[in-house]
Each structure stands twice: as structure tokens, then as C-alpha cells.
């Protein structure tokens, strides 16, 4: 086959002059985006680019997760369950992408990482304000996390705002209450700046929804969507843990944590405990 025959000709109407038009690069601000990868190792280590891009893309996805979860919470407040579930469905797909993304970083061997890790100083994923905001939005509130971000006023304010706002679970329970379900008053009037604690009185409410799904389909579907969210989050946490274990073993984290041991404890945290507890009660 000749080169000429293996070439796609540009159609005559394809725009070529962008001197006064918005282009792909200008719309996405690619010069800014693609200049943000600045390795600090000296001499520059080949694999640091992977490390930087892995974390930068994670931050972009987390930005979208927050965008969708905030919208979902707002739609729940206005009783628009359909729109809320649509946003949550999108978040679930993002979560799967984030989880699979660990497989790329896992190609970084312990030897390779050790050759530039010392240049990272005390920077650590633990300091990701967006990750912390996602945990807060899902209900894992912890005011003691805020001091980590005092040197970044914008991030500190963002997290403070999320801490003070109801979580998506709080909004869902308030929605159910407005729909006539008997949600315990203690949950409707709780201090939303604190992590949700297991409430046994809520389990019978979910039991009724699950055992009468046909009559409560919207609530039933929402319950399952939230279960998916937590499952996906736990899978992400697990892949994070395993990637750390295979890369640095049981070394302490760059930010001062115990490393893998600290990540292991995160697997014990839960967002929607009653939605898992009800499974024991269904059919009994």
C-alpha cells in the first residue's frame, strides 16, 4: 500500500485557522495543564513522571466526584431523587476508574520508587483536601483532620464548609422522612459535623423498604446505589493499601503516618452501616 493511499485527507470544511477561534488546547487550557508536571528529583528520575501524573489525574477525578456528590445532595434536598441517582451513578463509574488506576502505579517497583522518594519531603496523599472532602461528603467527618490544611486557607475553608454541611446520607435520610418513612428524630437532628454512628432504630426502616421494594422502588434503588458507593470506596481503599504494601512494604509514610498500617485502619470505617446491617434482618 502506498503512503498516499494510507493517508486520510482533510475534509474541506475542517477548521484550520484558530487565530481568532477557540481551539481544543485553549478550551482545555492544555498549556497550563501539561506544564504542571514538574519532577523534583535530581537528577530527574524517569518514573517520577508516572508518580506525578497518577496523583494529578486522581485529583481531577476527585474534583468531578465532589461536583457530582454536591449536586446529588442538592437534588435530594429538593426531592429530585432521579437526578440525584443519576449523579451517583456517574460517581460509581469514576470510582471504578480510580480503582483500576492503581494498576498503573503498581508498575512502579520498590527499587524505582526508592530512588526518588526522598525528594518528596513530607508531601503525602493524606494531605489531599479533595479526598478528605469526599470522605466528609459521604459522612466520615473528623474535625481533627482540619489542622493538616491550615497552611492552605482555600482548602481549609472548603473542608470547613463540607464539615458543617449535611452528608449525602443525612440528606437521604431527610428525604426519606419527607416521603413518610419513620426516620429516628435523633438522626434528623444530629450534629452533622460528626461522623455518622450506627443507629439500630434505622434498620427496621430499611428492612421495610427492602422487603417491600415494589412499593418503595425509588427508596430501594437509592439504598442500593449508596451500597454501591461504599463498596466502590472500600475497593479503592484496598487497592491503595495493596499498592503501598507492594511498593514500600511497611515503611512509614512520607507524611508521618505508619504507612500501610494506617491505611489498613481505614478499611474499618463505614459510611452507611445500617444499609449493610439490614441484610442480616431481611427475610427474618
From Swiss-Prot:
Residues bound to heme: 240
Reactions catalysed according to its record: L-tryptophan + O2 = N-formyl-L-kynurenine
Molecular function per GO: heme binding; metal ion binding; tryptophan 2,3-dioxygenase activity
Bound cofactor: record note: Binds 1 heme group per subunit.
Biological processes, Gene Ontology terms: L-tryptophan catabolic process to acetyl-CoA; L-tryptophan catabolic process to kynurenine
UniProt-listed SUPFAM superfamilies: Indolic compounds 2,3-dioxygenase-like
PANTHER family listed in its UniProt record: TRYPTOPHAN 2,3-DIOXYGENASE (PTHR10138:SF0)
Protein known as: Tryptophan 2,3-dioxygenase
Lineage: Bacteria, Bacillati, Actinomycetota, Actinomycetes, Micrococcales
Amino acid at each position: 500500500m502506498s503512503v498516499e493511499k494510507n493517508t486520510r485527507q482533510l475534509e474541506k470544511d475542517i477548521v484550520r485557522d484558530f487565530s481568532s477561534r477557540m481551539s481544543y488546547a485553549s478550551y482545555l487550557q492544555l498549556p497550563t495543564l501539561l506544564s504542571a508536571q514538574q519532577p523534583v528529583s535530581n537528577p530527574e528520575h524517569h518514573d517520577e513522571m508516572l508518580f506525578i501524573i497518577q496523583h494529578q489525574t486522581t485529583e481531577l477525578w476527585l474534583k468531578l466526584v465532589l461536583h457530582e456528590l454536591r449536586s446529588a445532595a442538592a437534588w435530594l434536598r429538593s426531592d429530585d431523587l432521579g437526578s440525584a441517582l443519576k449523579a451517583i451513578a456517574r460517581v460509581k463509574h469514576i470510582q471504578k476508574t480510580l480503582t483500576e488506576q492503581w494498576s498503573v502505579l503498581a508498575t512502579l517497583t520498590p527499587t524505582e520508587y526508592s530512588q526518588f522518594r526522598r525528594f518528596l519531603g513530607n508531601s503525602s496523599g493524606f494531605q489531599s483536601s479533595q479526598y478528605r472532602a469526599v470522605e466528609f461528603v459521604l459522612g466520615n467527618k473528623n474535625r481533627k483532620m482540619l489542622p493538616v490544611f491550615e497552611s492552605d486557607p482555600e482548602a481549609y475553608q472548603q473542608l470547613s464548609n463540607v464539615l458543617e454541611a449535611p452528608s449525602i446520607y443525612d440528606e437521604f435520610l431527610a428525604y426519606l422522612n419527607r416521603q413518610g418513612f419513620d426516620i429516628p428524630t435523633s438522626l434528623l437532628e444530629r450534629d452533622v459535623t460528626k461522623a455518622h454512628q450506627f443507629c439500630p432504630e434505622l434498620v427496621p426502616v430499611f428492612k421495610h423498604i427492602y422487603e417491600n421494594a415494589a412499593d418503595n422502588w425509588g427508596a430501594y434503588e437509592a439504598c442500593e446505589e449508596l451500597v454501591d458507593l461504599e463498596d466502590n470506596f472500600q475497593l479503592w481503599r484496598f487497592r491503595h493499601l495493596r499498592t503501598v504494601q507492594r511498593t514500600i512494604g511497611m515503611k512509614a509514610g512520607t507524611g508521618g503516618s505508619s504507612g500501610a498500617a494506617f491505611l489498613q485502619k481505614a478499611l474499618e470505617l463505614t459510611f452507611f452501616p445500617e444499609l449493610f446491617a439490614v441484610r442480616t434482618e431481611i427475610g427474618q
